[in-house]
């Protein structure tokens, strides 16, 4: 939620961090009421996007703090069946993600890591260093949605890269969007 960010960074106030963890539980509850099970969550989509519209980036320290001290404990209490994955990783900054994953509390906090876009560039190195995690790809690059032969070849190359480097899932959810939006 944009009200939890200032200057496009998540506010690192314990009240806001706990509120955000509670939001996850509310969404999981709402989905459950609709008969939709949630088996895994990631703390934020594209947490390294610096855009010209309001965003919510995170520092490595903030990512560790939120996942270790707030999200994982809250879910363990209220939704122990839901796994926590680190993601989505949309940066090729190995140093940042390595800093997060090297925290000694992370193996007890997350079960996997989700990648998309530039994050795929560091997948092989991270998987080699951290083989204990499950790895997934979370959003296919769809470009301008042309879905022509050239786009198919590009997507096939992406699938080959992610699956060939140990991802257990390849997600192309954006392929089902309506042309021109809703």
Where are these regions (language model features)?
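Substrate-binding cleft and catalytic face of glycoside hydrolase catalytic domains
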Residues: 1-98
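Structural recognition of the beta-strand scaffold that forms the well-ordered cores
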Residues: 39-43, 83-86, 111-115, 134-139, ...
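Glycoside hydrolase catalytic-domain groove-lining segments
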Residues: 73, 77, 81-84, 105-149, ...
């Amino acid at each position: 939620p944009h009200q939890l960010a200032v200057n496009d960074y998540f506010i690192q106030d314990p009240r806001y961090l706990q509120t955000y963890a509670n939001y996850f539980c509310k969404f999981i509850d709402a989905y459950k009421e609709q008969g939709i099970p949630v088996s895994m969550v990631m703390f934020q989509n594209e947490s390294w996007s610096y855009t010209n519209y309001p965003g919510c980036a995170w520092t490595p320290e903030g990512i560790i703090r939120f996942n270790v001290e707030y999200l994982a404990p809250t879910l363990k209490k209220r939704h122990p069946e839901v796994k926590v994955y680190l993601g989505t990783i949309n940066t090729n900054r190995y140093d940042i993600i390595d800093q997060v994953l090297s925290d000694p509390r992370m193996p007890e906090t997350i079960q996997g890591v989700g990648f998309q876009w530039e994050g795929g560039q560091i997948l092989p190195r991270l998987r080699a260093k951290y083989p204990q995690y499950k790895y997934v790809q979370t959003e296919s690059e769809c470009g301008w949605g042309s879905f022509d032969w050239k786009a198919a070849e590009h997507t096939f190359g992406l699938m080959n890269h992610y699956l060939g480097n140990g991802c257990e899932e390849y997600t192309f959810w954006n392929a089902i969007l309506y042309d021109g939006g809703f």
